[in-house]
Structures are given as structure tokens and as C-alpha cells.
Amino acid sequence: MSGKTSYKDLLLAPIAKNNPIALQILGICSALAVTTKLETAFVMAIAVTLVTGLSNLFVSLIRNYIPNSIRIIVQLAIIASLVIVVDQILKAYAYGLSKQLSVFVGLIITNCIVMGRAEAFAMKSPPVESFVDGIGNGLGYGSMLIIVAFFRELIGSGKLFGMTIFETIQNGGWYQANGLFLLAPSAFFIIGFVIWGLRTWKPEQQEK
């Protein structure tokens, strides 16, 4: 293992210490698009985690054989192949979720987090470290998606995973659903509050 970085650090640091969305401000588009429901956010989190981990692994395995002039093309080809596999599995076994996620599974190919880890880490590190780093960054991305989706679905519709938590007034209950949280701008507010919370907890993340 290079330097003093442990597998534990590679796996856990992206969740709070160096979160791809909260600190690096990457992957924001999908964080807005797929977080209206916890179910879609959870599936997207798993998909990105698998693609990031496996793409890092494969890029690292062949890194010494990739000509520098075409390294980005090779990385994209590996990532695209993995995304196609994930997309086909979703269509085969979870067609409803695949329809809800729509084009956003395919857009994992252009996700800055996936490309960034392949270029910045996997091209310079051994396979096992690269795989763990990819899984860690996928978990960091996924954890933010799940946090955002939790609040958006709960406040926006009174549900979690499609199950009623707060009975809405329309259905004879007491809760007035806030439709604003089902719109994309609400995700910005939630992400902002999470960033504020993280930087209050970890002052070293605050920009000078």
C-alpha cells in the first residue's frame, strides 16, 4: 500500500472527510435528478458505487499498458462498458426503476466522480487500493444521494420507499405535503445544509 493510507481511510474518507458532492462539488446533476424518491436514489447509489469501484480496478490493472495519449479514451471505454452492463441488469430485473432513472444511468459515463478517480487515482495506484478507493467514493456519493432523497420524499410526499409515513390531508390525515421538495431546487437547499453541517463539524473543510 502506498504511503500511509490504509484501506479503511480509502473507504471511509470520501463519506465525510472528502465527500465528492459536499466537498469536491462533483456529481451535482444526478443529485438533483434522481433524489425525489429514496428508492431511485438507493439504486443510483449502488450503480455508481459498482461502476466506480470496478472501473478503478480495471483501469489500474492495465495502467502500465495504456499509452498516455489515449488514456482518457480507454478509461471512457471501460466505464461505458460497465454502465451498459448495469443498465441492462436494471432493465432485466428492475424495469420499473430503470424507467424512473431514465437516461441518468447512462449518464454515469460522464460522471466527474467516476472519471476523476480513474484518472487521478487508478492510473497511479495498485488494483486493490484503486478498487477500495472507487467503492469509497461511490459510497460517499451514494450517502449524499440518500440523505437528499430522504428529506425530499418525506417532506415532499410524506413517504419513504413509497410507504406512507405521514398521512396527508388529501388522504384524510394531518400532514400537508410540501410540493417544493419534489422540485429540483430543493436538492440545492438540502445539499447546502449538509455542507454547512459537515463544515461546522469539520472546520478544516471551510474555505479560507
Swiss-Prot record:
The chain crosses the membrane at residues 42-62, 72-92, 103-123, 131-151, 178-198. Coiled coil: none annotated. One of its GO terms (biological process) is sodium ion transport. Pfam families: Rnf-Nqr (PF02508). Its main location: membrane. It is an enzyme of class 7 (translocase). Keywords: Cell inner membrane, Cell membrane, Ion transport, Membrane, NAD, Sodium, Sodium transport, Translocase, Transmembrane, Transmembrane helix, Transport, Ubiquinone. Signal peptide: none annotated. It is a multi-pass membrane protein. It catalyses: a ubiquinone + n Na(+)(in) + NADH + H(+) = a ubiquinol + n Na(+)(out) + NAD(+). Its EC number is 7.2.1.1. It comes from the Bacteria. GO terms for molecular function: oxidoreductase activity, acting on NAD(P)H, quinone or similar compound as acceptor. InterPro entries: NqrD, NqrDE/RnfAE. GO terms for cellular component: plasma membrane. It is found in: Cell inner membrane. Belongs to the NqrDE/RnfAE family. HAMAP family: NqrD. NQR complex catalyzes the reduction of ubiquinone-1 to ubiquinol by two successive reactions, coupled with the transport of Na(+) ions from the cytoplasm to the periplasm. NqrA to NqrE are probably involved in the second step, the conversion of ubisemiquinone to ubiquinol. Composed of six subunits; NqrA, NqrB, NqrC, NqrD, NqrE and NqrF. This is Na(+)-translocating NADH-quinone reductase subunit D. The gene is nqrD.
